[in-house]
Regions:
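Helix-terminus/linker motif at the lipid-water interface of multi-pass membrane proteins
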Residues: 14-33, 102-109, 165-172, 232-265, ...
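Small-residue-rich hydrophobic transmembrane alpha-helices
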Residues: 32-92, 129-148, 255-317, 350-369
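Short alpha-helical transmembrane segments in multi-pass integral membrane proteins
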Residues: 1-2, 60-127, 169-225, 281-346, ...
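N-terminal transmembrane alpha-helices
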Residues: 1-21, 25-26, 40-55, 59, ...
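Transmembrane helical elements of multi-pass membrane transporters/channels
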Residues: 1-19, 121, 155, 184-188, ...
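Residue-level signal for transmembrane alpha-helical positions in Major Facilitator Superfamily
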Residues: 14-15, 52, 93-97, 127, ...
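Hydrophobic transmembrane alpha-helices of multi-pass small-molecule transporters
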Residues: 44-47, 159-164, 189-193, 265-268, ...
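Short runs within selected transmembrane alpha-helices of multi-pass transporters and secretion channels
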Residues: 122-140, 148-156, 177-190, 271-274, ...
């Protein structure tokens, strides 16, 4: 079950890398910097998607283990309609307040127009981004991992095909990358719509099922809240880091955007393993099969460590070619190589955090997972970024994420061990 999830995660990585890669082929570091500055927008969209998708999939897995098919219908319908409504509201805010939002993110006169073009088109795709991502989690919870993977691949393949057409062929640059992303998410959303209506016998899109009262809504959101907080605070910390780096010029901003995308391979590879087995965690807990739960946890952590170590080693030896693949600018490449080394220091062990958090969510212990998310992307990371920048400058600031990762990994192991007892 985890293999399609891993493939879906890698597809997501390729999806996110595509925009930066094709914009980088324009040879304009300012456009790469502009796309980097808008990263928080996509991260925030994924925060909502993760809240509905991860929360819903965990509750659906438990409901399936209990053979409660009526709850599955209500949860799936609620997730779908909530995703579309939140996406539409998010788009309205982006379109109405584009300029102040981008200035808050650190855009200046040289990057603003590029960032604005990208943001406007991403806004139009917001409902589809949220629902297609949330639906992939829900479909996987039903045991249809292959179908979830297909949905992700449809959006990614479309994006990869359309990126060069809009970015270079039609000369739209950064805005063209956003157009391709929006169309890709629309196609993925159409596929999941087909699955809900024609393939699944348990899911529902009926509005009457979505109006399920506050009980299911609270359960979904509370379980998915740790993952959503993880993404939302990642948005805030990304903005903070961008604002710190802007003081050193646009080259470090462009470099960190590339490093974020490149490092996603290491992170999402392990996140895919953890997410792929979450239905097993939920089903095993719902059915009272504690041995299966524990065996799955141990095996998943071992897999995360092995693939994390291998990916980190690969990145270390190929660090300069990896950054150079995205942009042909010596200044950006120099910054990027240094930043990539700093970010991949926690690569072999970050999967332990994801597995521990998923275990906590699957047994209904959302609060500890929420606290860990807040620490990793907020309460610990953001002050640390400012402190390290003040003491060690740019080189210190880019070490903040890896230091925070190791602290939260250790805490998650201690907390989950106590819960498991």
């Amino acid at each position: 079950m985890a293999i399609p999830s891993v493939i879906s995660s890698l597809v997501t990585v390729v999806y996110n890398m595509a925009d930066t890669f094709f914009v980088g082929q324009t040879g304009d570091a300012l456009q790469v910097a502009a796309v980097s500055l808008t990263n928080p927008i996509f991260i925030l969209l994924m925060a909502f998607a993760n809240m509905f998708g991860m929360g819903g999939s965990a509750i659906i897995s438990v409901a399936l283990g209990e053979n409660n098919h009526q709850s599955v219908k209500k949860i799936s319908s609620f997730i779908s309609w909530a995703s579309l409504v939140i996406g539409a509201a998010f788009a309205a805010v982006l379109l109405c307040f584009t300029a102040p939002i981008l200035h808050l993110f650190g855009a200046d006169t040289s990057t603003f127009e590029f960032a604005r073009g990208y943001t406007v088109y991403i806004a139009f795709g917001a409902p589809f981004v949220i629902w297609s991502a949330a639906a992939s989690f829900v479909v996987r919870a039903e045991g249809a991992s292959k179908e979830a993977m297909i949905g992700s691949m449809i959006g990614t393949i479309a994006n990869i095909i359309l990126d060069p057409v809009f970015v270079s062929g039609l000369g739209q640059g950064a805005a063209g990358a956003a157009i391709a992303t929006t169309i890709g998410n629309m196609l993925a959303a159409l596929y999941y719509l087909w699955y809900f209506l024609k393939k699944s016998r348990r899911f529902s899109l009926a509005p009457k099922d979505a109006l399920c009262g506050t009980h299911i809504a609270v359960r979904v959101c509370s379980v998915g809240f740790p993952t959503a907080i993880f993404s939302a605070l990642m948005c805030v910390s990304t903005i903070v880091l961008n604002l710190i780096l802007v003081a050193y010029g646009n080259a470090p901003v462009a470099a960190i955007g590339i490093v974020f995308k490149a490092n996603m391979f290491i992170t999402f590879l392990q996140m895919g393993l953890a997410n792929g087995v979450q239905p097993i965690f939920g089903y095993s807990y719902g059915a009272g099969d504690i041995k299966r739960f524990a065996d799955t946890e141990r095996f998943t952590k071992l897999c995360c460590f092995v693939v994390g170590l291998a990916a980190t080693a690969l990145y270390f030896f190929l660090r300069e070619p990896i950054i150079g693949l995205f942009v042909d600018d010596s200044g950006v490449i120099t910054y990027g190589v240094q930043m990539l080394i700093a970010y991949m220091l926690s690569g072999p062990f970050i999967g332990f955090l994801f597995v521990n958090m998923n275990c906590m969510q699957s047994v209904g212990r959302a609060l500890p997972a929420t606290v860990l998310s807040v620490l990793r992307q907020g309460l610990l990371l953001i002050p640390l970024l400012y402190l390290l920048n003040a003491v060690f400058g740019l080189n210190g600031a880019v070490l903040g994420q890896s230091i925070t990762d190791y602290v939260t990994i250790a805490l998650s192991c201690v907390v989950w061990r106590r819960i498991r007892r």
